[in-house]
Amino acid sequence: HYYRALNYVLHHMEDKTFQYQEHIYFERNGLMLDCSRNAVFTVEKVKFLIRILAKLGMNVLMLYTEDTYEVKSEPYFGAYRGKYTRDEIKEIDTYAAMFGIELVPCIQTLAHLHNALKWPEMSKIRDSADILQPGKEETYQFIEKLLISVKENFSTSRVHLGMDEAVMLGLGNSLRENGYKEGSLLIREHCERVMDICKALGLKPMIWSDMYITANTRGGYYDVPENADCSQWEKPDRNLGLVYWDYYHDDIRDYEKMLGLFDYHVKASSTDIKAYYQEIYNCLSEDCTKSAKYGLVFSFYEKLAAVLSGKADLGVHIKDAYDREEKEILKEISQNEIPDIICNLEEMKRIREEIWMTDAKPFGYELLDVKLGGVITRLKSTGRRIDNYLNGKVSRLEELEETRLPYFTDEMDKRENRWDRITSGCDLNDTI
C-alpha cells in the first residue's frame, strides 16, 4: 500500500497537515488483464496499468494469456496473434515488481485453446475444437512446455492453470480412441498429471473451480441443489487452489432492466431505443471535452451512441414502412438516415483503430475491419436495395417479407446476441 499512501500524500501537498487511515482486508487484491480476446496490450500499456494499480493500492496483476505468450519449439502456439515474447514478459514482470505488484501467469491447460488447436499441427493433442485430449502423453509433454515457459519468464511461483468451461471434455477424439469415461474422473486424472508437472517445476497452481462442480453434478456452472450429497464427489488435490467465478447467478431483480434488451423484437419493448442512445450521445458529447487523457475513449463511445441512435431500430422501421407501403419513409431512410449512420460509423471505426493501435499490438484488428467494414457495406447495400424498390427496378423486397423469428424462444434463457450467429441465416463458409 506504499504507492496508494504516496498517492494520497501527493493529493494533499498543499495541506499543512492531514490524516488518513485504512484497514487492509485482503492479503492480495488486483486485476486480471485479458490479453486473449484478439487485443494484446502493448508492454507500455501494461506498464501504464501497473502504475494505476499501484496508485490504487493493489498488489496483483494476473496476465490472462490463452495462447498469447511465447513457448519454445511451438511456433503455431499464438501464431499471428501478437503473443508476448519471453523478453516482453520478463520486462513486464520486472516493472511490476518495482511497484510491489506480483505478475501472475493465467494460462489454459485444458479448454479455451481453440485459437491454438485450430492448426493441423496441433491436431495430435486435440480432443474437441478447444479442448486438449486428456490422458494422452503428447498432451502432457505440451503442457510441460507451457509451464516451463511460465517458470522461466515469471518471477512468481504461483500460476493459474485455467481448466474452466471444458463442457465437452472426453467427448471428442478421446471418446473415439478410448471409449466413454466420466467427466469427474477425467478432470481429476488430468489435474493430477498437471499437478505432477507443477510440483516438479516448483509451481503453486490454482484453477477455476467450475469443472469440479459441473463434472460432479452434470448441471450448469455452479448449479448445485441445496440437498446435494457431496461426500462421493471427485475432489482435487489439497494443494490445488480453486478459484470461484460465477457471473450467471444473482438476484433476478438485478437483471430485470437488462432482460428487456433481449426481447423477441425491439418493437415489443416500450423503450424508445433511438431516444435512449441519443441521450447517451448527448451526455458523452460533453464528457469528450473534459478528459485530456481519456478523451479519445469518450469520443469512441460518443460515436457508438450516435451510430446506435440511428441503427438500433433501423431494421424495425424499414420493415414497418415496407409492410405499410410507405415509400416516402423508405426514401427518407435510404437518402438521409442510412448515409448519416454510415458517416458516424466510419468516424467511429477510425477512432477505434487509433485506440487499438495505441494500446495494443496490431494483430487482431483485421477482424474489426471485417466486422465494422461489413456493417458499412451492408448499410450501403440496404440503401441500394431500397432505392431499387422505389425506382421500380425490383417489384418487391423478399428479405423483408420473411416472417421474423426470435433467435431465442420464450422457453430458452435469453442471453447475448452473437455477431457470428445473427449476421445471416446463411453460413459464411458455404458462400460461393
Whereabouts are the PLM-identified features?
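Substrate-binding groove of N-acetylhexosamine-processing glycoside hydrolases
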Residues: 8-17, 51, 91-94, 100-102, ...
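Feature activates predominantly on carbohydrate-active enzymes
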Residues: 1-206, 250, 257, 275
